[in-house]
Curated annotation (Swiss-Prot):
InterPro entries: AceGlu_kinase-like_sf, Asp/Glu/Uridylate_kinase, Uridylate_kinase, Uridylate_kinase_bac. Its EC number is 2.7.4.22. It is an enzyme of class 2 (transferase). The gene is pyrH. SUPFAM superfamilies: Carbamate kinase-like. One of its GO terms (molecular function) is ATP binding. It holds the Pfam family AA_kinase. HAMAP family: PyrH_B. This is Uridylate kinase. Keywords: Allosteric enzyme, ATP-binding, Cytoplasm, Kinase, Nucleotide-binding, Pyrimidine biosynthesis, Transferase. Residues 25-30 are annotated as: Involved in allosteric activation by GTP. UMP binds at residues 59, 80, 141-148. Gene3D superfamilies: Acetylglutamate kinase-like (3.40.1160.10). Catalyzes the reversible phosphorylation of UMP to UDP.
Length: 244
């Protein structure tokens, strides 16, 4: 691909956090095939820029550990482990969607499940990136009480990513939920400190604190819009940058 076709691409390695909810579309549960197809093509567009791409997937479309304790009566740790297995299902689905369109990828799990994927090892993950493979990280950080947002921050930092991209259902960070508050204000840029002090729950405190400590910017955008990831990578469209 020529340089003229990829203007303003300033990243060499990025991490995208994909929530489980983003994969279910309008179904209400599980993975929507059309959503997987759209997302895989959006990822391929960025991949074709020559950018090394790693993903962290959530599992909320199948099981939400933190919010499932009350109806199921399970202890929180057990809920979280079930949620980690849900992320594995999503990761394998996304891997297959990518490889259908000839994008080589590897699933690496924080919990050893060697019959279906590799165990996450930092140097192995980086080597896959260097070989031109998309790395899909599953099972969060491998421990209960940590969200997949925190896993995204951790993996992004330890793999030396230039930025962490958080795909949501809105085009950035707002002062309030724009779907409920008409006069909610969208931020083009906001500091980690202000995000935390205003209690804007776009990511959990641990994830934001990790990114802040290591000065890795978090970029929040609407993942549901076709081609939005590639646009944001090129500095186009609407998004919010969280930084110092």
């Amino acid at each position: 691909m020529s340089e003229s076709s990829t203007p303003n691409v300033k990243y060499s390695r990025v991490l995208l956090k994909v929530s489980g909810e983003a994969l279910m579309g309008e179904k209400g549960f599980g993975c929507d095939v059309e959503v997987l197809d759209k997302l895989s093509h959006d990822l391929k567009e960025v991949y074709d820029f020559g950018i090394q791409l790693c993903l962290v997937v959530g599992g909320g479309n199948i099981f939400r550990g933190a919010s499932s304790s009350s109806p199921f009566g399970f202890e929180r740790a057990s809920n979280d482990y079930i949620g980690m297995l849900a992320t594995m299902m999503n990761a394998l689905s996304l891997q297959n969607a990518l490889e259908k369109i000839n994008v080589q990828s590897r699933v690496l799990s924080a919990i050893p499940i060697t019959a279906v994927c590799e165990t996450y090892i930092r140097r192995r993950a980086i080597r896959h990136l260097e070989k031109g493979r998309v790395v899909i990280c599953a099972a969060g950080v491998g421990n209960p009480f940590f969200t997949t947002d925190t896993a995204a921050a951790l993996r992004g930092i330890e793999m030396g990513c230039d930025a962490i991209f958080k795909g949501t259902q809105v085009d950035g960070v707002y002062s309030a939920d724009p779907k409920k508050t008409v006069d909610a204000v969208r931020y083009d840029r906001i500091s980690y400190r202000d995000l935390l002090s205003l209690d804007l729950k776009i990511m959990d405190v641990a994830a934001v604190s990790l990114a802040r400590e290591h000065s890795v910017p978090i970029i929040v955008f609407n993942l549901g819009k076709r081609g939005s990831f590639a646009d944001i990578i090129r500095g186009r469209g609407l998004y919010t940058t969280i930084c110092n």
